[in-house]
């Protein structure tokens, strides 16, 4: 039985949006936001300008969607790696946090995340968008982890939400330092040592 017209249209629209995001992501990483035009994006995606403006208000709106896409991919990667590591070598929740922070800092040296999220993101979208991104993908995850760690008595009882915001602020600053550094790998190592010392200090005595 043939699919309804509405279903086919929805599938086509989703495919067009995915093509635009894929093309824009590659261009924003390779050339940066300022050097990428909407003409570049529609040519790479092989769609019309009308299709682009049907899905996105303007180039900034497209960039916002790409940045969220990159951030979501990173979270999936971090969570997946953490689950795999926990299965292979079970450790304490504090150990898992230390490993997760190290993995996040490694990702900050990655081209997609560094260029789109760390370099262009704060400049193009401003601090409000950055705060929204960190809250959506960082604060909620850390709050849940901290609550579990407190319940298992690995760390002292503290306001989990406030502590999560403070840790995310540290991670955010570290990531921006790495993204703007002349030597990102060295900055990553230095920031990693400092953050690890802070996290170890959370251990319940």
Predicted regions and their residues:
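Short hydrophobic/aromatic patch on the recognition helix
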Residues: 46-56
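Amphipathic alpha-helical packing segments from all-alpha helical-bundle domains
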Residues: 72-76, 95, 99, 118, ...
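Alpha-helical DNA-contacting segments of helix-turn-helix folds
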Residues: 64-70
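Short coil/turn segments at alpha/beta junctions that flank glycine-rich nucleotide-binding fingerprints
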Residues: 30-34, 111, 152-153
